[in-house]
A protein has these predicted regions:
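Active-site-adjacent structural segments surrounding the nucleophilic cysteine of cysteine proteases
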Residues: 1-70, 186, 212
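Conserved active-site-adjacent core of cysteine acyl-enzyme catalytic domains
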Residues: 44-179
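N-terminal propeptides
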Residues: 182-225
C-alpha cells in the first residue's frame, strides 16, 4: 500500500501561466508541465519538503530536460528524483500502447503492491489527445491515479482495461521504506491504547519513586496546595 500522495495540478492558478519553455516556444506549466508535476507530487510526498510543479519545471529547464515544442524528455525523472535521494528508473523501453495484456502491466501492478509509485506515460485516449504523464499508486486493493491535469472521476478512477490499453511507458519510484513508516490517521482505539500505556508507565514511575526526599516533598506540596 502506498502513502496517499500529495495532489498537485499543473493548471493550478498559482503557476499555470508560469513559463515552462525553451527558446522558440511559449509553453507554460499549465500547458506542458505534466511530467514535472508528477515528479513534484512524488518528491513532496516522500521527503515532506515543499516542492511545487513550478519548482520542478524550473529544475527541468535548468538541467536541459524541456523538449522543444513538446513536453519533458523521458530522461528527466531519474535525475530529478535522484536529486532528492529517491531511486527511480524506466521500467523498460517496450511500448505497451494498445497492448492491454502485455506483461509490463503485470510487472507494474506487482511493483505498486510492493509500495512503489509509478509514473505512466499515457497516449491518445481517455487521458490525452497526444501524450500525458500521470502518477499511479496503490491503496485498499485498487489502482489510484493522480492526474496532474484533471480531478474528473473518469481520469482518476479510470477503467483498468482502458488504462492498460493507453499506457505506453512506466517509470518506477521506490517508495517502499517511506510507505512502511507509520502514517495512519489517529483513531480513538489507538489513542486509548496509547493513553493506557502511558498511564501504566506513569504509575510505575510513581511506585518506583514513592520513597525518600522526592516523595516527602511531593506529599508536602499536595497537602499545601
Amino acid at each position: 500500500m502506498n502513502k496517499k500522495p500529495v495532489s498537485y495540478l499543473q493548471n493550478d492558478p498559482r503557476w499555470k501561466d508560469k513559463p515552462y519553455r525553451v527558446k522558440g516556444e511559449s509553453s507554460t506549466v499549465g500547458s506542458a508541465g505534466c511530467g514535472p508535476t508528477c515528479a513534484a507530487m512524488v518528491i513532496q510526498t516522500i521527503t515532506g519538503k515543499t516542492f511545487t510543479p513550478e519548482d520542478a519545471c524550473n529544475w527541468s529547464i535548468q538541467h536541459g530536460y524541456k523538449a522543444l515544442k513538446q513536453g519533458t524528455y523521458y530522461s528527466y525523472f531519474k535525475p530529478q528524483l535522484a536529486a532528492f535521494g529517491i531511486d527511480c528508473d524506466q521500467l523498460d523501453w517496450t511500448a505497451t500502447y494498445g497492448k492491454p495484456n502485455h506483461q509490463n502491466h503485470q510487472r507494474a501492478l506487482e511493483l505498486l503492491k510492493q509500495g512503489y509509485y509509478l509514473i505512466a506515460l499515457m497516449n491518445k485516449g481517455a487521458w490525452t489527445s497526444s501524450g500525458h504523464f500521470v502518477l499511479v499508486w496503490w491503496a485498499d486493493g485498487k489502482i489510484r491515479i493522480n492526474d496532474p491535469a484533471s480531478t474528473k472521476d473518469a481520469r482518476v478512477n479510470g477503467d483498468p482495461y482502458d488504462f492498460r490499453s493507453q499506457a505506453k511507458y512506466y517509470w518506477w519510484v521506490d517508495a517502499r521504506k517511506y510507505n512502511n513508516e507509520e502514517d495512519d490517521d489517529m483513531t480513538q482505539d489507538k489513542f486509548n491504547e496509547m493513553f493506557k500505556t502511558a498511564m501504566g508507565a506513569y504509575r510505575q514511575e510513581l511506585r518506583d519513586n514513592d520513597s525518600g526526599e522526592w516523595s516527602k516533598k511531593a506529599r508536602e506540596y499536595a497537602v499545601s496546595s
